[in-house]
Structure formats: structure tokens, C-alpha cells
Amino acid sequence: MGSIGFIGGGLMATAMIKGLLQQGYPATEILVSDPDPKRREILGALHVLPFQDNQEMLWELGKREGEGVVLAVKPQVVKEALAGLTFPFLPVLSIVAGYSLAALARLLPAEVRILRAMPNTPALVGAGITALSAGAKCGEADQKWAEKVLGSLGKVVIVPERLMNAVTGLSGSGPGFVYFLLEALIDGGVLAGLPRPLARELAVQTAAGSIKMLQELQEHTVDYARQELA
């Protein structure tokens, strides 16, 4: 296994790192740069190699048999994070929301092979679904590498980039709608006299069981709704 470098060590990057470690990826082959000392302390506890400076991390990655770089910073700091960086000849996988392949290409050296991904919040517990789009310069090996890394967060689907905005609206924002629906069910149970912990357990397991039925039986969603209302 080669080394992987992370620019940004926030929650999603940390979830990816934990997933990789659980899959047996060596901690000493994971390099992470983040300016926040608290994040570096958290990352250090995972026995990966934390760096304060992005370029220093990339230089170290370049000395190794590197596999790729994951860009995992907030959208508002992308330009600052990438300014003036020299990259090793490796693919760059971006999980930055709202940044297209073309926008990233304007910020990165011309020779960099770029991939774009959109994970969702259930990825934080290894149960997410991530859409992946590869740039024109990427080869099959680059995409396979990205799929491996993103697989640490859950399921991965390949989509053309023109569909990424639709993906963002559905699976990217979708968990928020599910959480609000569950909160309404829980509140309804409380209003009907249930203790909140019991109402929460009932609502969450009802949702989990319903989703498992959809996954395993493959029938149309509305068919189940009609069965429940019959």
C-alpha cells in the first residue's frame, strides 16, 4: 500500500481515515495537514502523521510511494489552502462541496488529475453513499483508487459530473429531510404520551426496518405505502 495525503482533517476526512484504518490501511501511510492544533491532536491519536503545513505534507508524500491526495477542506478556504502548492504526480480527490472539476482545475497545476466526490453525513458512521466523477485526465487506476478511499465511508456510485448537482440535492441534502421526518414522528409519539427515549427508539427502528425492506425486497416505495394504508 502506498501513502495517502489529506489536505484538511475535519469530520469527513477523519471518518475516511477511520474507515481506512478499520480496513487495515497502515496508519503510518496516512498523512494529514490541518492548521487547527486540536484537529491535529485528534488525528495524532489515530497514529497517522499530522502536519500543520499543506506543502510540508505534500513534500513528505512526494518522497514516498504515494497513491493520491484527498482535498477535504471547507469551500470558503479552498483557494487559500491550494495557493502556491506544488503537488506530486498523483490524483487529487476532492470532497469539497460546490466545487466543479473545472473550478478545481483553475486552482491546481495543469498536470493534476482531478476527481470530484459528494459524500453525505451518514458517511460519518460508515453508512453513507458517495457520488464520484472523474476528470478527463483520469485513468481507470485513478478512479479505482478513489473508489477504494471513498468506500471507507459506505457505498460509492459513479455519475457524470453534469448530474452532481442533482446528487447533491438528493443524497447530499436528503439526510436532513429524513432527520426532520423522524423528529416529527418522535414529537408525535411524545404528544401521544410516550416517553421521548421510547418514542425515539420506535421511530428510528421503524425507519431502519422500512429502509431494510426497500433494500432487500426491491419493490417500489409506493407499493409499501399502499400496503400500510390498506
Positions of the model-derived regions?
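Small-residue helix-packing motif on alpha-helices
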Residues: 30, 40, 57, 195-203, ...
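Short pre-catalytic strand/loop immediately N-terminal to key active-site residues, enriched for Gly-Thr
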Residues: 4, 164-169, 225-227
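Internal alpha-helical scaffold of NAD(P)-dependent oxidoreductase catalytic cores
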Residues: 103-113, 129-167, 178-220
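A structural micro-motif
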Residues: 2, 28, 48-49, 90-91, ...
